[in-house]
């Protein structure tokens, strides 16, 4: 199983590299007048992304295979929303390759600039000298969702698990939380030195095909509600009533709290709580020790020696015409 997984990950990374090279050549470097109409929706062995500037009622007539009863899936991630932050276009329609989201990323410009600045020092044991072919990581002409998806994809395909990557990008308000465990604070402090928060009112749903989950921004400014039914269906949406659910079939319901995560792992066959997810991530490495050895606080730096001003400095300055 371990060998197969490594080979599968290599194959996924190879497809990622090919897609990035081809996309850059066509969308950014070619002279084609309609180059931005080209967009690779998924190129995945696990997921198929259906994309279109459609209303919900137009989806099934446009993609009739979705109505075929032999077409089965264990998850579906659906997005229906007007474009509010960018000019609407087919390639910007959601879902993206790994996520879809309700809200906006207010820190986008800073996030994009910092991702650009990191490229000069980027290195990878997985991509070696080919890593420059992945640049720019956050592609131009994307929406805030598309840029977030680009960076999330890089983190996942560089070896991080999906929940860890999402925690790095959408952290909790951890600095002054007296009830948060030290291990989790240590993780967030370590992660903050690698990746600044992608902040803003946002409810983000994410999947890699083996896990699907959701996270709410740390201010809790977007709703996310869920139902769990007695036939093992989980329905999460930005509001109640998106799908009809008989009340007597509901075994659990609730809403995401600010900064909290909701995750289903299909390999393990279970719904995993926020506490369990983050405890596992926070304890996978000695983050506290790494922080102690690598982070230098300003208050710990030695003070510069204090020197007294020469008593006749001011008269001399005036003598030389200083005012």
Model-found features: residue ranges?
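Single conserved hydrophobic/aromatic residue that forms the stacking wall/gate
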Residues: 1-12
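Short, glycine-/Ser/Thr-/acidic-enriched flexible segments
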Residues: 55, 82-84, 104-106, 111-113, ...
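Active-site-adjacent "gating/activation" loops or surface patches in catalytic cores
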Residues: 65-91
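Conserved catalytic alpha/beta cores of large enzymes that bind or transform nucleotide phosphates
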Residues: 106, 112-189, 240-323
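Phosphate-interacting basic helix/loop segments used at nucleotide- and nucleic-acid interfaces
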Residues: 182-202
């Amino acid at each position: 199983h371990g060998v197969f997984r490594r080979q599968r990950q290599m194959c996924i990374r190879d497809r990622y590299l090919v897609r990035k090279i081809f996309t850059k050549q066509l969308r950014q470097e070619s002279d084609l007048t309609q180059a931005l109409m080209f967009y690779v929706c998924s190129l995945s062995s696990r997921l198929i992304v259906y994309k279109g500037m459609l209303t919900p009622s137009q989806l099934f007539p446009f993609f009739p295979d979705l109505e075929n009863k032999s077409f089965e899936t264990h998850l579906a991630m659906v997005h229906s929303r007007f474009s509010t932050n960018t000019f609407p276009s087919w390639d910007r329609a959601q879902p993206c390759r790994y996520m879809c989201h309700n809200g906006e990323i207010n820190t986008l410009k800073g996030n994009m600039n910092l991702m650009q600045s990191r490229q000069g020092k980027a290195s990878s044991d997985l991509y070696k000298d080919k890593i420059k072919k992945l640049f720019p990581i956050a592609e131009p002409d994307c929406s805030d969702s598309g840029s977030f998806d680009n960076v999330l994809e890089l983190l996942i395909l560089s070896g991080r698990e999906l929940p860890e990557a999402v925690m790095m990008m959408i952290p909790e308000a951890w600095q002054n939380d007296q009830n948060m465990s030290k291990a989790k604070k240590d993780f967030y402090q370590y992660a903050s030195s690698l990746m600044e928060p992608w902040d803003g009112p946002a409810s983000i749903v994410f999947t890699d095909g083996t896990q699907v989950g959701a996270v709410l921004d740390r201010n809790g400014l977007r709703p996310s509600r869920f139902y769990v039914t007695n036939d093992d269906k989980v329905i999460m949406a930005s509001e109640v009533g998106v799908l009809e659910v008989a009340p007597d079939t509901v075994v659990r319901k609730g809403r995401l709290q600010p900064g909290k995560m909701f995750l289903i792992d299909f390999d393990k066959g279970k719904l995993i709580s926020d506490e369990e997810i983050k405890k596992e991530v926070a304890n996978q490495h000695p983050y506290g020790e790494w922080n102690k050895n690598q982070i230098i606080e300003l208050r710990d730096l030695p003070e510069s020696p204090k020197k007294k001003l020469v008593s006749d400095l001011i008269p001399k300055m005036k003598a030389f015409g200083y005012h």
